[in-house]
Amino acid sequence: KRISIYVNIMNFKTICDSIFKLYLYADNCKMIHYSTDSNHEHELADKVRDSIIDFTDNLAESTFGYYGKPKYNDLTVEQSISMTNDLGKLCQNTVDIAEAIRSDFNKNEKLSGIVSLIDDFKKEMSKNVFLATFDKVSNYQMKK
């Protein structure tokens, strides 16, 4: 009966895919972490990765707590993301995914806690984009 719950929000499979895309961006951070010559970028890549993982874990637990556990077949790591070696751009990519979920979840008052979680994540990623400007790691500017 899960289908009736999702009438006004994005497809459950799309939510699951979005969650696993976020995890892949966390892995992308590790690629930056290992390949950079900048100590600042090395440390920031791990900070960004930890932020993404913590947020994604909380997002998944909260979403599945409200809508129910996904079936194993609803989950896949076979996702396509825009791989990048620019931490600022990577932060924006994760915010774009979270914002798509926020737009739909904002329609349901009972999901206000998840909307707040997403808003906090967006603020955290904005700070990380700013920190990435130090040592010229990135000159990326967050979208308004």
Regions found by a protein language model. Name each.
Residues 1-9:
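Compositionally biased low-complexity segments enriched in polar/charged residues
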Residues 18-34, 59-62, 94-102, 124-136:
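Long, well-ordered alpha-helical segments
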Residues 24-47, 104-111:
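Helix-loop segments that flank and shape redox-cofactor active sites
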Residues 30, 53-54, 110, 130:
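Extracellular secretory-pathway ectodomains and N-terminal mature segments of eukaryotic proteins
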